[in-house]
Amino acid sequence: MFTLSQTSRAWFIDRARQAREERLVQKERERAAVVIQAHVRSFLCRSRLQRDIRREIDDFFKADDPESTKRSALCIFKIARKLLFLFRIKEDNERFEKLCRSILSSMDAENEPKVWYVSLACSKDLTLLWIQQIKNILWYCCDFLKQLKPEILQDSRLITLYLTMLVTFTDTSTWKILRGKGESLRPAMNHICANIMGHLNQHGFYSVLQILLTRGLARPRPCLSKGTLTAAFSLALRPVIAAQFSDNLIRPFLIHIMSVPALVTHLSTVTPERLTVLESHDMLRKFIIFLRDQDRCRDVCESLEGCHTLCLMGNLLHLGSLSPRVLEEETDGFVSLLTQTLCYCRKYVSQKKSNLTHWHPVLGWFSQSVDYGLNESMHLITKQLQFLWGVPLIRIFFCDILSKKLLESQEPAHAQPASPQNVLPVKSLLKRAFQKSASVRNILRPVGGKRVDSAEVQKVCNICVLYQTSLTTLTQIRLQILTGLTYLDDLLPKLWAFICELGPHGGLKLFLECLNNDTEESKQLLAMLMLFCDCSRHLITILDDIEVYEEQISFKLEELVTISSFLNSFVFKMIWDGIVENAKGETLELFQSVHGWLMVLYERDCRRRFTPEDHWLRKDLKPSVLFQELDRDRKRAQLILQYIPHVIPHKNRVLLFRTMVTKEKEKLGLVETSSASPHVTHITIRRSRMLEDGYEQLRQLSQHAMKGVIRVKFVNDLGVDEAGIDQDGVFKEFLEEIIKRVFDPALNLFKTTSGDERLYPSPTSYIHENYLQLFEFVGKMLGKAVYEGIVVDVPFASFFLSQLLGHHHSVFYSSVDELPSLDSEFYKNLTSIKRYDGDITDLGLTLSYDEDVMGQLVCHELIPGGKTIPVTNENKISYIHLMAHFRMHTQIKNQTAALISGFRSIIKPEWIRMFSTPELQRLISGDNAEIDLEDLKKHTVYYGGFHGSHRVIIWLWDILASDFTPDERAMFLKFVTSCSRPPLLGFAYLKPPFSIRCVEVSDDQDTGDTLGSVLRGFFTIRKREPGGRLPTSSTCFNLLKLPNYSKKSVLREKLRYAISMNTGFELS
């Protein structure tokens, strides 16, 4: 009973709870329904009200209303309040447009104060409401301006409308209410306008104008009309002028308006009178004063992206070009702000491509994105930046240096005309280079005297820092900057004179001290040196030989001698003192700059001499010390060899080269030792098919085998092995014969240059089957000759040797400079085009080259479509370089690459990089000096009874010394060794050694030395008079076979005849 009662009670309570909850839910539902109904009714009511209001507004703006032009200002005010009350941009844009037109129409009414919309500002009851209303209307105009696209015709009309609204109500000059008696109201109205403008500025007015200007101007074809651009720029200026050029308003003006891409360019083209307003308010000076403060400049740059900082800089430079007087007075500030903006941009410049970089057409790889508008305007921005290195600005910046006079000697030196070999006569050149002209000495010698902390020096240093920063920041237009800086012929010589005057002693010591000082002053001085080197290097690179040696543009040859001496010492000290070893950043850039200028001068001197003997050597560097350091793997010694090997005497470098080869041979096991013999490769060559057999058997050999010992056995025309054992001699003959045949122009693998007949790959060598493999084989044979120290009489064209050394990969390499070594007449014709004063199009040239190839005229386009592009005064320099590059590189690119590949498979590139072009030729073909007979006599070996005191031998040396000319002595050497030039290191290094053997019989009967032949030769016993026989030779053994003549006159006659007829090219 009790349990049942408890159960019933629980059930009852639970049921009561459920009923209570249901009542609460129902009540909540009813309350929610009421709320929803209220919202729906409210929405419907609002919608109905909005619809009614919009209908009322639409009725108000009906176009066919005859009273529409004379609506009262109050009516417009009331309808505007209603529109603003429910305004939605997408839904009410047309109504807003009509409102604006109605307001502007009311402002144009004549003598009807009640119609003028602005008249409500004079009503005490409505003034505040009217001000608030016009603020809202104008800001909605700004909102529309941010969205409209100027390139669309309908949008451009709306832009004009909304700009007109902004122009009208931010300035009282067009308000008719202020005419006559209303003039007294102007101060109050001006105050209202200032209040309105302040409101707009607080809400981002300058951002709106920036968007509009950028959207309308930063495009392939600007689409802002003159009126629109004038209105927008006038609106931008108003707050600044009204605030009397307050810093608070100059800052946003610079950030938002002056950073619009190429704005000043567009203003000068479309509405130049706006620039007059800028000039009348001296705006450029105010900008300079604001930005020269480092903190403010940094703030502006950080507010802009790097790209827009560049736009700001371009606009300021353009303004500066229009206001030279301001720049003259504010040079220091202008230089400072330009340097700071460039430094800010440089922070985002990257050296290489990555996932985080974007390509910028001026800055290169850039760590910020580049928007479409900027890309479209980049050509205009670049033109603005060009003002920085334009002549007017350079004259203003460097006025202190350019105003100095360089004293000239009474008769300026003029170089002699170049010889056919394009070599300046050394005697006359050196005489001119060291004329004792006091005025020149004063210019060139590092006299010192100027305090480096003086205002004058600091100003020049700051300017040099600016231009050096521009070179490292604006990487893609670097050449343009260098060209602009070198345009004035006297700037660089005067800058060099200025550098020579710095410090207590001037010259080298000051700059070496700067390397060890990490002060701002030292960095600025080194930046000046870098700028001088970069510009001078660029200038000398683009000048041809006539301009350098004869016209002596910018630098006299005497100056180049002094500059090269300074650079040589500076680079050597940087390396030897250990500065380069760990160099990075600015120090590394300095070294690259100075070293680059040095090597341009050195290579030009190698091509055509202008320095005295031993000018490039360092007297304080002993080769023995350097070689000891190389053996110890000292870094500085390796760097000397890498960067400035020319400071070591040539003979020592050749010794070093031979040492390197020997060490490699030892490493590869190619040298015979007491415990092992090197592997020998045996080849059999048919004498009638020497080239073909040599090619087939050697081209398959491995690199190791090619460097090793190769033994040759010749087979004659009958198929019989020729007698004789090859102990390098037969291989030497084989190598010389192969090289002689492949370099024969008749084979058409190689051609000779006009004039001096030097060899280079034939452009038509492709007619040979497998011609590239042939060139690779030739490269291996040439490399093998150099590797073994076998000199071969193969004179190469200078430009081809440059390619063999890899000089053509240098950024400073100029094809035009090397062109005379290919075709001096063609070079003269091209340089005459450069100097042509008339209209070059009259010559009818195109960017193409017509060539007669085996009877057919072939047109080679220098660039794609070049045959349709005429050569003009603007592109003639490009034409000259393209033509030179085509003749010396493009035409023979594949052949050259194949030969270099073969050559480098034997000779490592780093081995020969320590030689200049002429030195490489000497390494290949021997010394071009006269034959040293005493050295030859000292290293001659005698056989067959001959000895140093034998009368025939005494006659021989006397004839060579007294009776033969230098040319005949060269012919004699070629007769015996097959090469007319002596070995580079002297005859001690001739392998096999120079030998003379007494012979009593003809070559076909000669069996070599026997006891009888030796005794007969020694005691001058003859079987018969050999007077009818000629001397012969075995070039493979460097052996002269000399009959035992009875008279000196007979020896002289026979020897002269033999060498002139070259009868001795035979095999023993």
From Swiss-Prot:
Subcellular location: Postsynaptic density
Active site: 1036 (glycyl thioester intermediate)
Pathway: Protein modification; protein ubiquitination
SMART domains with a match to the protein in the record: HECTc, IQ
Effect of residue 963 to N: In KOS; uncertain significance
Stored CDD domains: HECTc
Reactions this protein catalyses: S-ubiquitinyl-[E2 ubiquitin-conjugating enzyme]-L-cysteine + [acceptor protein]-L-lysine = [E2 ubiquitin-conjugating enzyme]-L-cysteine + N(6)-ubiquitinyl-[acceptor protein]-L-lysine
Tissue specificity statement from the Swiss-Prot or TrEMBL entry: Widely expressed.
EC number: 2.3.2.26
This protein's UniProt keywords: Acetylation, Disease variant, Intellectual disability, Phosphoprotein, Synapse, Transferase, Ubl conjugation pathway
Phenotypic consequence of residue 997 to P: In KOS; likely pathogenic; loss of positive regulation of neuron projection arborization; contrary to the wild type, it fails to rescue defective neurite branching in UBE3B-KO mouse primary hyppocampal neurons
Effect of residue 779 to R: In KOS; likely pathogenic; loss of positive regulation of neuron projection arborization; contrary to the wild type, it fails to rescue defective neurite branching in UBE3B-KO mouse primary hyppocampal neurons
Domain IQ positions: 29-58
Any single biological process term in GO: regulation of postsynapse assembly
Modified residues (N-acetylmethionine): 1
HECT domain: residues covered: 702-1068
Name of the protein in question: Ubiquitin-protein ligase E3B
Gene expressing this chain: UBE3B
